[in-house]
């Protein structure tokens, strides 16, 4: 028998590879593990400590020089401390806001509209750590904020999460949401779900709401559906001619 790696002859009792290739593969695996561990250590080293971290000392908090306030919460939620340098390095919008003599830069207070305290806190924490605990609502809230403040890494992170939560039941509303916020990855995945389940979804209440509120989306959905039908028919015709 021949080795699947180097194509050299090997004894039949060996499982698919010769001894040399097996040893080499094991060494490569160990090397990759070491590289992964090294990368993890570097990420941990480069991860910025946030004033929102549990156990952060009051000393480190004293070095913050800006606070963010969620204006949606009228119950007097506490301001969220941060560092201008971090906000500026993570967001072009914050950079323009804080490097010029705008009100936020002078006052040291940034009011964020249409966002809950929890969403804003998670957003700021992500800017420091590239970590966020998501559910579907939080992912939507953070995607909106990441688009507004041009935090591309966070937007991609939220999009990937939302795609994993897609189903025929939520595909229509997710499609409308993704369209509104330019979330192309989610948009394409939701459209695929809709097209695959078109016969069921056209009878749903969400579909009728979409017809009334945003008929252009319905046009796009039907264009995608008809395109799929044409491609399917063309594929069937080609197969029958070949046979």
From Swiss-Prot:
Domain BTB: 64-136
Database matches in PANTHER family: SPECKLE-TYPE POZ PROTEIN (PTHR24413)
Keywords, in A-Z order: Coiled coil, Ubl conjugation pathway
Name of the molecule in the record: BTB/POZ domain-containing protein At4g08455
Subunit structure, as described in the record: Interacts with CUL3A and CUL3B.
Organism expressing this protein natively: Arabidopsis thaliana
GO terms under cellular component: cytoplasm
Chain's role: May act as a substrate-specific adapter of an E3 ubiquitin-protein ligase complex (CUL3-RBX1-BTB) which mediates the ubiquitination and subsequent proteasomal degradation of target proteins.
Pathway assignment: Protein modification; protein ubiquitination
Comment, domains: The BTB/POZ domain mediates the interaction with some component of ubiquitin ligase complexes.
GO-annotated biological processes: proteasome-mediated ubiquitin-dependent protein catabolic process; protein ubiquitination; regulation of proteolysis
Pfam families registered for this protein in UniProt: BTB
Molecular function terms, GO-annotated: ubiquitin protein ligase binding
């Amino acid at each position: 028998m021949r080795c699947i790696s180097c194509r050299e002859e090997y004894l039949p009792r060996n499982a698919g590879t010769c001894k040399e290739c097996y040893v080499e593969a094991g060494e490569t695996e160990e090397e990759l593990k070491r590289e992964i561990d090294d990368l993890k250590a570097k990420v941990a080293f480069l991860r910025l400590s946030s004033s929102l971290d549990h156990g952060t000392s009051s000393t480190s908090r004293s070095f913050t020089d800006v606070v963010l306030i969620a204006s949606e919460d009228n119950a007097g939620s506490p301001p969220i401390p941060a560092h201008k340098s971090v906000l500026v390095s993570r967001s072009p919008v914050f950079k323009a806001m804080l490097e010029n003599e705008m009100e936020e830069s002078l006052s040291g207070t940034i009011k964020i509209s249409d966002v809950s305290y929890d969403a804003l806190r998670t957003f700021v924490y992500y800017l420091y750590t590239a970590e966020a605990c998501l559910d579907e609502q939080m992912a939507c809230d953070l995607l909106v904020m990441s688009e507004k403040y041009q935090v591309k890494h966070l937007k991609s992170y939220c999009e990937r999460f939302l795609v994993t939560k897609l189903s025929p039941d939520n595909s229509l509303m997710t499609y409308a949401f993704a369209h509104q916020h330019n979330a192309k990855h989610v948009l394409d995945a939701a459209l695929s779900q809709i097209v695959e389940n078109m016969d069921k979804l056209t009878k749903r209440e969400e579909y009728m709401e979409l017809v009334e509120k945003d008929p252009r989306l319905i046009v796009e959905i039907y264009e995608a559906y008809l395109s799929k039908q044409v491609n399917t028919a063309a594929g069937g015709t080609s197969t029958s001619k070949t046979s």
